[in-house]
Amino acid sequence: MISRKALGSLVCLSAVATLIWIASGNWKVHYLPYYLPCPGIFSKKLQYLGDKPVQLFPQLFYQQPRVLAPKRQDVLTVTPWLAPIVWEGTFSPEILDSAYMPLNLTIGVTAFAVGKYTRFVSRFLKSAEMHFMKGYRVNYYIFTDNPKMIPDVQLQPGRRFDVVHIKKYSSWQEISVRRMEAINLHIAERSHREVDYLFCLDIDMVFHNAWGAETLGDMVAAIHPGYFNVPRSQFPYERRSSSAAYIPDGEGDFYYGGAVFGGLVKKVYEFTKICHMTILADKANGIMAAWQEESHLNRHFLTHKPSKLLSPEYLWDDRKPKPPEIFLIRFSTVDKNYQEVRN
C-alpha cells in the first residue's frame, strides 16, 4: 500500500512534470501565482552523524568589506584551487567566533615529546594556554616514551591534557616517520570520539600571538617559512623516482612544513593513514624520504590539495629575520641545538 505522504509526493511530481511539458510546447507561457502543495519535500532536514547544526551569524557591527580594496595586496590570499591562505588582515576573529563558538567544538592537539624533547612541553603548553583557541574546549595529547618527565601544567577550565605512552625508537628519523602511525592509531582508538578538529604540532615551538578559528578547515596545511618566497625548483622535495614521496621537477604548488597540519578529525585520520602507507612502502624498498614524513606530506598535498593554507605566521623560525609581509608571528620554533636534543 502507498502511504498518504508518498502519494502526495507523486501527485506533486506529476503536477511539476505536467507544467514542464506544457511550458516546453508552442503555447504561450503564462505565469500563474500558484504554489504546488509539496511541503513534505521542502520540510526535510538531514543531520548527518557527527555534523554540527549550522548557526546563523548574530548581528555584528564591523567595517564593510570592499571588493576593490582588499586588506592585503602584498601577498597571495587564495590558491589556484580557491583555498584561502590565512594572513593577518584577511579575516575577522569576531565574525568567525560568532559562527564557531555556538557549535561547542572541541579542538585536539597532538605533540610528540620523545627523549630530550620533554624539556619543551612546559613552554609549549603555557604559551598555548595564552594564545591557542581561546574560549574553545581543547584536548592536548602529549605522546612520549617517558611519561614521568612530562610536567603538570595548570590549564584553563574546559581544557585538559593527556599523556600517551609510546615506544622508544633508536633514532630521531625513525621517531619522525612513526609519527603518522601513532596519530592514526590514536584517532582510531580514542580521539575520534573526543574532538571535532585535530591539529598535529611540533612540541619544540611556542605560541606568540592568537591562533583561533580562522585556522579551522577540512584539511589544513602550513607554508614552510624557509620556502615561501622561492621558486619550486628550490623546494627540497623527494626527487628519487623510486620513493613513494617522489615529486618530479616542474611540479608542486608550495612547500609545506611537517610541523603543522590539521583539520576535521576524520580528514586527519584518512591523511595520516595514507601517509603511513606510503612511508611503509618506502621502508619495504629500503628507502627513507629526504625529509621523512614531511616529504610524504608534501607528496600527498600535491594530488590531494588542502582546503586551507596557513601563512608562515603560523610556522615561523625565530632564527630568521621577520620580513615586511609577516605582520606578526603566531607560532615559531624554539632556538636550540638540534644535534644535542636528538642524541
UniProtKB/Swiss-Prot annotation:
The chain crosses the membrane at residues 7-27. It is a single-pass type II membrane protein. Its cofactor is Mn(2+). Residues 28-343 are lumenal. Binds 1 Mn(2+) ion per subunit. Residues 1-6 are cytoplasmic. The keyword Transmembrane helix applies. Substrate binds at F112, A113, V114, G115, K116, Y117, D202, I203, D204, H224, P225, G226, Y227. The keyword Transmembrane helix applies. One of its GO terms (molecular function) is globoside alpha-N-acetylgalactosaminyltransferase activity. Pathway: Protein modification; protein glycosylation. GO terms for cellular component: Golgi apparatus; Golgi membrane; vesicle. Belongs to the glycosyltransferase 6 family. This is Globoside alpha-1,3-N-acetylgalactosaminyltransferase 1.
